[in-house]
Amino acid sequence: MAMPAALLAASLLVGTVGVASAQEVGGNRPREVNVEVLVEAPEEDPKRKSDPIPPLAMPVSDAASLARVPADVIERDGLQLVLDRKHHQLLVLRDGRMTRRYPAAVGTTGWETPAGRFRVFEKVKEPVWTHPVSGDLVDAESEGNPLGSRWIGFYRDCNGRSGWDGEQYLDINGCTVAGFHGTPYRWTVGRAVSHGCVRLYEENVQEVFDLVRLGTQVTVLP
């Protein structure tokens, strides 16, 4: 089964959210998540077919999940997030103990969620999504909003990206942002299908949103 074009489009647009600065926006006021990129589809090879939908990650135990976390991360006090790209899951650690574990959708091949150590720099409730091509604003309640009800930004890069995404060739000129967010496509959670962002079930991203603060450390394991 090939990856649906609509799904890929949504994952690209999620992966190209631009955020200006560290901030937290709550209450009932929608927050527009701005886009700062130009997306172009170069001439494609008509003979190349869409890639199959990536499979769900194999389940692992709590012990196996913690075994992948570096010792210095385990030794840190306080709350922190650890994204395990290999097993498509998000771990919540507090004072070195794993308190929660969630399935997650991560970046697809060639568009992997950036590995490294970062910090949460923006939290948005009910984000308003800006279409990167038309400029249309899509409210959080709309079925056309791929961000879900929460946005937690932790990575920003302005070098641009390009390549095959499983469905088409894309060139992204400008800044891209990766973060945790909800998704209307529940079946994608647990798969490597995005362009870098991390999708969680709505009920899970709301829990994570309430747990973290601006500055919370995020470690992404390859």
Language-model segments: residues:
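N-terminal pre-domains immediately preceding structured catalytic cores
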Residues: 2-222
